[in-house]
Protein backbone atom coordinates (compact mmCIF):
# COMPACT_ATOMS: atom_id res chain seq x y z
CA UNK A 1 0.00 0.00 0.00
CA UNK A 2 1.32 3.43 -0.93
CA UNK A 3 1.74 6.42 1.30
CA UNK A 4 -1.30 8.63 1.91
CA UNK A 5 -1.07 12.04 0.25
CA UNK A 6 -1.96 14.37 3.11
CA UNK A 7 -2.48 18.10 3.16
CA UNK A 8 0.58 20.12 4.18
CA UNK A 9 0.14 23.30 6.18
CA UNK A 10 1.83 26.45 4.83
CA UNK A 11 4.63 28.46 6.51
CA UNK A 12 3.73 31.50 8.61
CA UNK A 13 4.13 34.02 5.78
CA UNK A 14 1.42 32.32 3.69
CA UNK A 15 -2.09 33.27 4.78
CA UNK A 16 -5.75 32.87 3.90
CA UNK A 17 -5.76 29.84 1.61
CA UNK A 18 -9.14 29.76 -0.14
CA UNK A 19 -9.95 26.82 -2.40
CA UNK A 20 -13.44 26.89 -3.89
CA UNK A 21 -15.39 25.41 -6.74
CA UNK A 22 -17.47 27.67 -8.92
CA UNK A 23 -20.76 28.65 -7.22
CA UNK A 24 -19.93 26.81 -3.98
CA UNK A 25 -19.51 28.42 -0.57
CA UNK A 26 -17.70 25.41 0.88
CA UNK A 27 -13.98 26.05 1.02
CA UNK A 28 -13.26 22.53 -0.24
CA UNK A 29 -13.62 21.98 -3.99
CA UNK A 30 -16.12 19.26 -4.89
CA UNK A 31 -16.00 19.86 -8.63
CA UNK A 32 -18.04 18.35 -11.44
CA UNK A 33 -15.77 17.29 -14.30
CA UNK A 34 -15.37 20.24 -16.68
CA UNK A 35 -16.37 22.91 -14.15
CA UNK A 36 -14.07 25.60 -12.77
CA UNK A 37 -12.45 26.09 -9.37
CA UNK A 38 -10.06 28.65 -7.88
CA UNK A 39 -7.17 28.64 -5.41
CA UNK A 40 -6.32 31.91 -3.62
CA UNK A 41 -3.68 32.74 -1.03
CA UNK A 42 -1.66 35.67 0.33
CA UNK A 43 2.08 36.04 0.77
CA UNK A 44 2.68 38.36 3.72
CA UNK A 45 6.27 38.95 2.62
CA UNK A 46 4.69 41.08 -0.12
CA UNK A 47 7.66 40.66 -2.44
CA UNK A 48 5.80 39.39 -5.53
CA UNK A 49 7.58 36.04 -5.28
CA UNK A 50 7.06 33.39 -7.95
CA UNK A 51 4.97 30.33 -7.09
CA UNK A 52 4.30 27.23 -9.17
CA UNK A 53 1.71 24.46 -8.99
CA UNK A 54 1.50 20.75 -9.73
CA UNK A 55 -1.50 18.41 -9.69
CA UNK A 56 -1.37 14.74 -8.70
CA UNK A 57 -4.11 12.17 -9.16
CA UNK A 58 -4.89 9.87 -6.21
CA UNK A 59 -6.86 6.72 -5.47
CA UNK A 60 -9.97 6.70 -3.29
CA UNK A 61 -7.76 6.12 -0.22
CA UNK A 62 -5.54 9.09 -1.15
CA UNK A 63 -2.54 7.02 -2.20
CA UNK A 64 -0.98 8.03 -5.53
CA UNK A 65 -2.73 6.49 -8.53
CA UNK A 66 -1.01 4.71 -11.42
CA UNK A 67 -2.17 7.21 -14.03
CA UNK A 68 0.31 9.10 -16.14
CA UNK A 69 -0.14 12.85 -16.02
CA UNK A 70 -1.32 12.88 -19.64
CA UNK A 71 -4.21 10.61 -18.61
CA UNK A 72 -5.73 13.12 -16.18
CA UNK A 73 -4.48 16.50 -17.45
CA UNK A 74 -5.00 18.02 -20.88
CA UNK A 75 -1.95 20.27 -21.21
CA UNK A 76 0.58 20.43 -18.41
CA UNK A 77 1.22 21.71 -14.90
CA UNK A 78 4.44 22.79 -13.17
CA UNK A 79 3.41 26.26 -14.28
CA UNK A 80 3.87 29.61 -12.56
CA UNK A 81 0.81 31.19 -10.95
CA UNK A 82 0.64 34.35 -13.03
CA UNK A 83 -2.37 36.07 -11.49
CA UNK A 84 -1.05 38.14 -8.60
CA UNK A 85 -1.85 41.58 -7.18
CA UNK A 86 -0.70 43.66 -4.23
CA UNK A 87 -2.83 44.69 -1.27
CA UNK A 88 -4.33 48.17 -1.31
CA UNK A 89 -4.24 50.66 1.61
CA UNK A 90 -3.66 47.97 4.25
CA UNK A 91 -1.43 48.10 7.32
CA UNK A 92 -0.25 44.57 6.55
CA UNK A 93 1.17 44.49 3.04
CA UNK A 94 0.75 41.26 1.07
CA UNK A 95 0.72 39.84 -2.44
CA UNK A 96 -2.48 38.04 -3.38
CA UNK A 97 -2.32 35.06 -5.76
CA UNK A 98 -5.16 33.43 -7.69
CA UNK A 99 -5.09 30.24 -9.75
CA UNK A 100 -8.09 29.36 -11.91
CA UNK A 101 -8.53 25.85 -13.31
CA UNK A 102 -9.15 25.12 -16.12
CA UNK A 103 -6.77 27.64 -17.65
CA UNK A 104 -4.76 27.91 -20.87
CA UNK A 105 -2.19 25.42 -19.53
CA UNK A 106 -4.17 22.94 -17.45
CA UNK A 107 -7.48 21.12 -17.81
CA UNK A 108 -8.61 18.19 -15.64
CA UNK A 109 -9.95 15.35 -17.83
CA UNK A 110 -10.46 12.47 -15.37
CA UNK A 111 -12.56 12.20 -12.23
CA UNK A 112 -11.22 11.16 -8.84
CA UNK A 113 -9.17 12.50 -5.96
CA UNK A 114 -6.47 15.12 -6.50
CA UNK A 115 -3.75 16.93 -4.58
CA UNK A 116 -2.67 20.40 -5.69
CA UNK A 117 0.83 21.36 -4.55
CA UNK A 118 2.32 24.86 -4.51
CA UNK A 119 6.11 25.33 -4.76
CA UNK A 120 8.33 28.39 -4.51
CA UNK A 121 10.99 29.39 -7.04
CA UNK A 122 13.54 27.20 -5.21
CA UNK A 123 11.30 24.18 -5.90
CA UNK A 124 10.55 23.83 -2.19
CA UNK A 125 7.05 22.65 -1.28
CA UNK A 126 5.00 25.45 0.31
CA UNK A 127 1.62 23.76 0.91
CA UNK A 128 -0.78 21.19 -0.52
CA UNK A 129 -4.57 21.05 -0.79
CA UNK A 130 -6.89 18.18 -1.64
CA UNK A 131 -9.84 18.38 -4.03
CA UNK A 132 -12.13 15.94 -5.83
CA UNK A 133 -13.58 15.89 -9.34
CA UNK A 134 -16.75 13.87 -9.95
CA UNK A 135 -18.80 12.55 -12.85
CA UNK A 136 -22.57 12.77 -12.51
CA UNK A 137 -23.20 9.04 -13.00
CA UNK A 138 -24.74 7.72 -9.78
CA UNK A 139 -27.61 9.28 -7.84
CA UNK A 140 -26.49 9.41 -4.19
CA UNK A 141 -28.88 10.01 -1.27
CA UNK A 142 -27.70 10.71 2.27
CA UNK A 143 -29.79 10.86 5.44
CA UNK A 144 -28.73 11.63 9.00
CA UNK A 145 -30.43 10.47 12.19
CA UNK A 146 -30.07 10.27 15.93
CA UNK A 147 -28.34 7.11 17.10
CA UNK A 148 -30.70 4.34 18.24
CA UNK A 149 -28.29 2.69 20.68
CA UNK A 150 -28.42 3.93 24.27
CA UNK A 151 -24.64 4.12 24.30
CA UNK A 152 -23.97 7.29 22.37
CA UNK A 153 -27.59 8.35 21.91
CA UNK A 154 -26.87 11.76 23.44
CA UNK A 155 -23.58 12.43 21.65
CA UNK A 156 -23.57 10.73 18.23
CA UNK A 157 -25.25 10.88 14.82
CA UNK A 158 -25.80 8.13 12.28
CA UNK A 159 -25.94 8.54 8.51
CA UNK A 160 -27.44 6.30 5.84
CA UNK A 161 -26.34 6.26 2.21
CA UNK A 162 -28.16 5.04 -0.89
CA UNK A 163 -26.43 4.62 -4.27
CA UNK A 164 -28.65 4.17 -7.34
CA UNK A 165 -27.04 1.73 -9.77
CA UNK A 166 -29.49 2.03 -12.70
CA UNK A 167 -27.12 4.26 -14.71
CA UNK A 168 -23.84 2.60 -13.76
CA UNK A 169 -23.15 -0.71 -15.42
CA UNK A 170 -21.85 -2.89 -12.58
CA UNK A 171 -22.36 -6.60 -12.00
CA UNK A 172 -20.08 -6.84 -8.98
CA UNK A 173 -20.87 -3.76 -6.87
CA UNK A 174 -19.25 -5.26 -3.78
CA UNK A 175 -15.92 -5.33 -5.65
CA UNK A 176 -16.30 -2.37 -8.02
CA UNK A 177 -17.99 0.25 -5.81
CA UNK A 178 -16.42 1.93 -2.77
CA UNK A 179 -18.05 4.58 -0.58
CA UNK A 180 -16.42 7.11 1.72
CA UNK A 181 -18.08 9.55 4.13
CA UNK A 182 -16.87 12.64 5.96
CA UNK A 183 -18.23 15.31 8.28
CA UNK A 184 -18.15 19.04 7.55
CA UNK A 185 -15.69 18.59 4.66
CA UNK A 186 -12.87 17.65 7.06
CA UNK A 187 -10.58 15.09 5.44
CA UNK A 188 -9.44 13.97 8.89
CA UNK A 189 -12.97 12.66 9.51
CA UNK A 190 -13.15 10.58 6.30
CA UNK A 191 -13.81 6.87 6.63
CA UNK A 192 -14.54 4.06 4.21
CA UNK A 193 -17.89 2.27 4.45
CA UNK A 194 -16.79 -1.35 3.86
CA UNK A 195 -19.85 -2.89 2.17
CA UNK A 196 -23.47 -2.19 1.39
CA UNK A 197 -26.00 -3.95 3.63
CA UNK A 198 -28.69 -4.76 1.07
CA UNK A 199 -30.12 -3.77 -2.31
CA UNK A 200 -33.56 -2.21 -2.71
CA UNK A 201 -35.02 -0.87 -5.97
CA UNK A 202 -31.59 -0.85 -7.65
CA UNK A 203 -30.16 1.12 -4.74
CA UNK A 204 -27.19 -0.06 -2.68
CA UNK A 205 -28.09 0.65 0.93
CA UNK A 206 -25.40 1.47 3.51
CA UNK A 207 -27.10 1.65 6.91
CA UNK A 208 -25.61 -0.48 9.68
CA UNK A 209 -21.82 -0.25 9.62
CA UNK A 210 -20.14 1.45 12.59
CA UNK A 211 -18.27 3.75 10.19
CA UNK A 212 -21.62 5.43 9.52
CA UNK A 213 -21.64 6.70 13.11
CA UNK A 214 -20.03 10.07 13.88
CA UNK A 215 -19.56 12.08 17.04
CA UNK A 216 -21.96 15.01 16.85
CA UNK A 217 -19.42 17.46 18.25
CA UNK A 218 -20.62 20.96 19.04
CA UNK A 219 -21.39 24.10 17.08
CA UNK A 220 -18.26 26.01 16.13
CA UNK A 221 -17.37 29.22 17.92
CA UNK A 222 -17.10 32.36 15.78
CA UNK A 223 -15.81 35.91 15.59
CA UNK A 224 -16.35 38.80 13.17
CA UNK A 225 -13.60 41.26 12.18
CA UNK A 226 -15.21 42.76 9.05
CA UNK A 227 -14.99 46.21 10.64
CA UNK A 228 -11.39 46.44 11.75
CA UNK A 229 -11.91 49.58 13.85
CA UNK A 230 -14.83 48.40 16.00
CA UNK A 231 -15.60 45.24 17.93
CA UNK A 232 -17.70 42.82 15.91
CA UNK A 233 -19.31 39.57 17.00
CA UNK A 234 -17.49 37.97 19.96
CA UNK A 235 -14.71 40.59 19.85
CA UNK A 236 -14.29 42.08 23.34
CA UNK A 237 -12.25 45.10 22.30
CA UNK A 238 -9.91 46.53 19.65
CA UNK A 239 -6.54 48.19 20.06
CA UNK A 240 -4.06 49.60 17.57
CA UNK A 241 -0.34 48.88 17.49
CA UNK A 242 1.50 48.06 14.26
CA UNK A 243 -1.71 46.31 13.22
CA UNK A 244 -5.19 46.39 14.69
CA UNK A 245 -5.61 43.81 17.43
CA UNK A 246 -8.90 42.00 18.01
CA UNK A 247 -9.15 40.55 21.53
CA UNK A 248 -11.88 37.92 21.68
CA UNK A 249 -14.13 37.32 24.66
CA UNK A 250 -12.86 34.38 26.76
CA UNK A 251 -14.35 31.00 25.86
CA UNK A 252 -15.21 28.36 28.41
CA UNK A 253 -15.06 24.57 28.37
CA UNK A 254 -18.46 23.46 27.05
CA UNK A 255 -17.95 19.73 27.54
CA UNK A 256 -20.47 18.52 30.12
CA UNK A 257 -22.78 21.52 29.76
CA UNK A 258 -26.24 21.63 28.18
CA UNK A 259 -26.25 21.91 24.38
CA UNK A 260 -27.12 25.36 23.03
CA UNK A 261 -27.96 25.91 19.38
CA UNK A 262 -25.89 28.58 17.65
CA UNK A 263 -25.77 28.96 13.84
CA UNK A 264 -22.34 28.33 12.36
CA UNK A 265 -20.66 27.67 9.02
CA UNK A 266 -19.22 24.31 10.05
CA UNK A 267 -15.65 25.46 10.56
CA UNK A 268 -15.44 27.60 7.43
CA UNK A 269 -14.42 31.24 7.09
CA UNK A 270 -15.47 34.09 4.78
CA UNK A 271 -13.20 37.03 3.96
CA UNK A 272 -15.11 40.33 4.21
CA UNK A 273 -14.31 43.97 4.89
CA UNK A 274 -16.44 47.06 5.41
CA UNK A 275 -13.74 49.21 3.81
CA UNK A 276 -13.02 48.56 0.16
CA UNK A 277 -14.66 46.79 -2.74
CA UNK A 278 -12.45 43.76 -3.31
CA UNK A 279 -11.83 41.74 -0.13
CA UNK A 280 -9.07 39.77 -1.87
CA UNK A 281 -6.79 42.83 -1.82
CA UNK A 282 -8.64 45.44 0.29
CA UNK A 283 -9.12 43.38 3.47
CA UNK A 284 -6.44 43.94 6.10
CA UNK A 285 -4.90 41.53 8.60
CA UNK A 286 -5.55 41.82 12.33
CA UNK A 287 -3.89 40.20 15.33
CA UNK A 288 -6.61 37.97 16.82
CA UNK A 289 -6.21 36.86 20.45
CA UNK A 290 -8.02 33.66 21.47
CA UNK A 291 -8.65 33.05 25.18
CA UNK A 292 -9.80 29.79 26.76
CA UNK A 293 -10.77 29.97 30.42
CA UNK A 294 -9.43 26.79 32.04
CA UNK A 295 -7.00 25.84 34.79
CA UNK A 296 -6.26 22.50 33.08
CA UNK A 297 -2.53 22.07 32.48
CA UNK A 298 -2.35 18.33 31.71
CA UNK A 299 -3.34 18.96 28.09
CA UNK A 300 -2.09 21.18 25.31
CA UNK A 301 -4.86 23.21 23.69
CA UNK A 302 -4.92 24.24 20.03
CA UNK A 303 -7.28 26.40 18.01
CA UNK A 304 -8.36 24.89 14.68
CA UNK A 305 -10.69 25.60 11.80
CA UNK A 306 -10.56 25.65 8.05
CA UNK A 307 -8.34 28.75 8.31
CA UNK A 308 -5.51 26.37 9.33
CA UNK A 309 -6.81 23.29 7.49
CA UNK A 310 -8.13 21.85 10.79
CA UNK A 311 -4.54 20.90 11.65
CA UNK A 312 -3.24 21.33 15.24
CA UNK A 313 0.00 23.09 14.40
CA UNK A 314 2.61 24.31 16.91
CA UNK A 315 1.99 27.94 15.91
CA UNK A 316 -1.67 27.53 16.93
CA UNK A 317 -1.00 26.15 20.41
CA UNK A 318 -2.36 28.21 23.31
CA UNK A 319 -0.03 29.16 26.16
CA UNK A 320 -1.16 29.04 29.78
CA UNK A 321 -1.36 32.32 31.70
CA UNK A 322 -1.45 31.27 35.36
CA UNK A 323 -2.02 34.83 36.61
CA UNK A 324 -5.31 35.07 34.71
CA UNK A 325 -6.17 31.36 34.77
CA UNK A 326 -6.55 31.05 31.02
CA UNK A 327 -4.84 29.76 27.90
CA UNK A 328 -4.31 32.25 25.09
CA UNK A 329 -2.90 32.61 21.60
CA UNK A 330 -2.48 35.51 19.18
CA UNK A 331 -2.34 34.90 15.43
CA UNK A 332 -2.62 37.07 12.33
CA UNK A 333 -5.80 36.57 10.29
CA UNK A 334 -7.41 38.43 7.42
CA UNK A 335 -10.61 40.38 8.07
CA UNK A 336 -13.83 38.39 7.90
CA UNK A 337 -16.08 35.94 9.72
CA UNK A 338 -14.38 32.85 11.13
CA UNK A 339 -15.45 29.61 12.76
CA UNK A 340 -13.06 27.90 15.15
CA UNK A 341 -12.87 25.30 17.90
CA UNK A 342 -10.43 24.14 20.55
CA UNK A 343 -8.95 20.66 20.66
CA UNK A 344 -6.89 19.01 23.39
CA UNK A 345 -3.82 16.79 23.10
CA UNK A 346 -2.40 14.90 26.07
CA UNK A 347 1.24 14.21 26.90
CA UNK A 348 1.12 10.93 24.96
CA UNK A 349 0.02 12.75 21.81
CA UNK A 350 -3.57 11.52 21.87
CA UNK A 351 -5.98 14.02 20.33
CA UNK A 352 -9.36 14.75 21.93
CA UNK A 353 -11.42 16.36 19.19
CA UNK A 354 -14.39 17.13 21.45
CA UNK A 355 -12.64 17.32 24.81
CA UNK A 356 -13.24 21.07 25.12
CA UNK A 357 -16.46 21.60 23.18
CA UNK A 358 -18.27 18.37 24.04
CA UNK A 359 -20.33 16.19 21.71
CA UNK A 360 -24.11 16.38 21.27
CA UNK A 361 -26.60 14.60 19.03
CA UNK A 362 -28.38 17.91 18.32
CA UNK A 363 -25.39 19.58 16.66
CA UNK A 364 -25.90 20.83 13.10
CA UNK A 365 -23.45 19.09 10.79
CA UNK A 366 -23.07 18.50 7.07
CA UNK A 367 -22.14 15.07 5.77
CA UNK A 368 -20.58 14.22 2.42
CA UNK A 369 -20.68 10.83 0.69
CA UNK A 370 -18.23 10.05 -2.14
CA UNK A 371 -18.93 7.07 -4.39
CA UNK A 372 -16.08 5.58 -6.45
CA UNK A 373 -16.02 2.88 -9.13
CA UNK A 374 -13.12 0.77 -10.32
CA UNK A 375 -14.13 -1.95 -12.77
CA UNK A 376 -12.03 -4.99 -13.45
CA UNK A 377 -9.00 -3.88 -15.46
CA UNK A 378 -9.31 -0.18 -14.55
CA UNK A 379 -6.21 1.58 -13.25
CA UNK A 380 -7.85 4.27 -11.14
CA UNK A 381 -10.90 5.07 -9.01
CA UNK A 382 -13.50 7.14 -10.85
CA UNK A 383 -15.61 9.37 -8.62
CA UNK A 384 -19.07 8.67 -10.03
CA UNK A 385 -21.35 10.32 -7.50
CA UNK A 386 -21.51 12.76 -4.60
CA UNK A 387 -24.24 13.33 -2.05
CA UNK A 388 -24.60 15.65 0.94
CA UNK A 389 -27.02 16.13 3.80
CA UNK A 390 -27.38 18.91 6.36
CA UNK A 391 -28.82 18.16 9.76
CA UNK A 392 -30.18 20.37 12.50
CA UNK A 393 -32.28 19.21 15.43
CA UNK A 394 -34.70 22.05 14.72
CA UNK A 395 -35.75 20.66 11.33
CA UNK A 396 -36.05 17.37 9.54
CA UNK A 397 -32.92 16.12 7.77
CA UNK A 398 -32.73 17.40 4.20
CA UNK A 399 -31.03 15.76 1.25
CA UNK A 400 -29.46 17.49 -1.70
CA UNK A 401 -27.41 16.17 -4.56
CA UNK A 402 -24.27 17.99 -5.63
Question: What label would you give each PLM region?
Answer:
Residues 392-398:
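Conserved small/polar residues in nucleotide/adenosyl-binding loops
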Residues 73-97, 187-194, 287-335, 347-374:
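Aromatic-rich carbohydrate-binding modules that target alpha-glucans
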Residues 120-126, 229-232, 346-355:
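Short acidic/polar inter-strand loop motif in beta-rich domains
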Residues 250-297:
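Basic K/R-rich, polyanion-interacting modules in nucleoproteins and related proteins
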Residues 5, 133-156, 361-384:
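Low-complexity, Pro/Ser/Thr- and charge-rich linker/hinge segments at domain boundaries
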Amino acid sequence: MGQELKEKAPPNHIGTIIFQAEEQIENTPIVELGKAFTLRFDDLNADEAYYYYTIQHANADWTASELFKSEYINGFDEVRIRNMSNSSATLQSYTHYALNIPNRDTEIISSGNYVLSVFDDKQELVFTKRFVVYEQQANVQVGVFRLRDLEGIDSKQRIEIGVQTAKINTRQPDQEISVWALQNYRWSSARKIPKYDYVMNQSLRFEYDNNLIFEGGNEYLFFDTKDIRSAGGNVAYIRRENLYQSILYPNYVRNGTVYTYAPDINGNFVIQTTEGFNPNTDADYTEVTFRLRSSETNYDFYVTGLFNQHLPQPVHKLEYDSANNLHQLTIRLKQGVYNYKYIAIDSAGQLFENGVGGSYWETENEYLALVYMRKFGDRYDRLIGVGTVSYTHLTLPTNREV
